[in-house]
Regions:
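One-carbon transfer enzymes
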Residues: 1-237, 298, 303, 315-320
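An anion-binding loop in the catalytic cleft
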Residues: 220-320
Length: 320
């Protein structure tokens, strides 16, 4: 089949790379415009664009598809001229109006990083970890105009491990999403079958995964240890959990685990142990977490061994 692929970050690039191994023809790639990135603020192509260029696939980077502007109408016409059978969308980042969704022969399919209708929205991976879900997955859906409201064609489950961060879970789901997409698109007959058997989402089960903010990454040490640990792992790699230091700078905390250390007289936020595993800090429910990876202001991220070598923290230190 002739496929248009629309996506931007690594999550999408994983799916594109897998599709490129099939016999389908990727007639075009749509991705976000190049953005400034890094310390040098150089214009940088998205992961999807870089992969497309490596395979000599035409790349389109419209700002939008709005029917109210000449630019949007031109983008719509450009896409229509590709005469694609289907369009696969994964973390593209642009709103697609109904006219675009209806352009390919079989419409547009989306790879979403949750088991819909749970965790519709911008941050499904992070919210699943932070909430304490024990499993998540990917959903392949036929796109509709609403936010992640399309009919579900295939769902694949992925367990959430106690050690998972958003980074590690992202990578697992990217692979599962790619595999599920190839399964649906195994043949034109296969696609027709999945479309015919698609399932409407139950609105009563909808939970929204609202966009992350930097402010919510500040650790509240009065919370239970399990909740703090989940938040730390959910906010890795962005926005990264942090706690203020005495000098008004922030200590970034990249990873943690639940601790078995006890200290009956300790208060929430107090360092109760430092050992080969990391820094053990008391939380609001009189259980502790173990910080296993942290970053001092202006420095690099340190593992447990490196943390102890710096000797910057001591027993009794109190995070606020």
């Amino acid at each position: 089949m002739k496929i248009i692929f629309a996506g931007t970050p690594e999550f999408a690039a994983t799916a594109l790379a897998t599709l490129l191994k099939t016999e389908h023809e990727i007639v075009a790639v749509y991705t976000q415009p190049d953005r400034k990135a890094g310390r040098g603020q150089k214009l940088t192509a998205s992961a999807v664009k870089q992969l497309a260029l490596e395979h000599n696939i035409p790349v389109y980077q419209p700002l939008h598809f709005k029917s109210s502007t000449e630019e949007g109408l031109a983008a719509q016409a450009e896409l229509k001229a590709l005469n694609a059978d289907v369009m696969v969308v994964a973390a593209y980042g642009l709103i697609l109006p109904q006219v675009v969704l209806d352009t390919p022969k079989y419409g547009c399919l989306n790879i979403h990083g949750s088991l819909l209708p749970r965790w519709r929205g911008a941050a499904p991976i992070q919210r699943a970890i932070a909430t304490g879900d024990t499993e998540t997955g990917v959903t392949i859906m036929k796109m509709a105009a609403g936010l992640d409201t399309g009919d579900m064609m295939l769902k694949t489950i992925c367990p959430i491990e106690a050690t998972d961060t958003s980074a590690t879970l992202h990578d697992k789901l990217a692979v599962k999403g790619a595999e599920a997409t190839v399964q649906v698109l195994e043949s034109e007959e296969s696609l027709q079958k999945y479309l015919a058997e698609r399932e409407v989402q139950d609105e009563a089960l909808t939970v929204y995964a609202h966009k992350l903010s930097k402010a919510e990454a500040q650790i509240n040490w009065s919370q239970p240890a399990a909740e703090i640990d989940r938040n730390i792992r959910a906010f890795n790699p962005w926005p990264v959990a942090f706690t203020p230091l005495d000098d008004s700078n922030n200590l970034r905390i990249w990873n943690s685990s639940l601790s078995t250390q006890q200290a009956t007289a300790a208060v929430a936020g107090e360092v109760i142990a430092l050992d080969k595993d990391g820094v053990h800090v008391m939380c609001g429910d009189q259980n502790a977490i173990c910080i296993t990876n942290l970053q001092w202001p202006g420095g690099k991220a340190l593992n447990a061994v490196q943390i102890n070598q710096t000797q910057k923290l001591s027993l009794g230190y109190k995070f606020t």
